[in-house]
Amino acid sequence: MKKKNGDIKKALDKENKIYFIKRLYELIDHGYMLEDSLEFLLIQYEVADDEIKKIKEKLSNGSKLSDILGYLGYSQLIVSKIKFAEDYGRIEDMLVEVETYLKIKKIQLVNNKVFPNRYFYHYY
C-alpha cells in the first residue's frame, strides 16, 4: 500500500495545481459542496487523513476557499483572485480564470526554458 503524502504542498506540484483547480471547478459546477469537493480531490492526491481533517476543520471554523488554497501552497495572486470572487459571488468563474492563468504561466515557463535568449537578438 502506498504511503499517503504528509506534506500537502508536495502533493500539489505546479502541474497538479492546474488540474486541482480544474477538477474543483467541475465538481462545484456539478453541484458538489465545497467541502466534499476538496475532500474528494485531496483523497485523490493521497493527502494524509490528518491534513484532510485539518482542512475540514478550517472550513467548519469559517475559513474560505481562498484560505484553503493559501494553505495548499497557491500563490498570493491566486488567493487574492479567489478572495475577490468570494466577495462578489463568482467563484466558479474565477476558478476557470485561475486555471487559464496557470496554464499560460506554465507555457511561458516552458518557452523561457526552451528559448531563454529569444529576445537577445532583437536588441543588438
How should each PLM-predicted stretch be described?
Residues R118-Y124:
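Alpha-helical transmembrane segments of integral membrane proteins
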Residues M1-R118:
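Catalytic metal-binding core of the metallo-beta-lactamase
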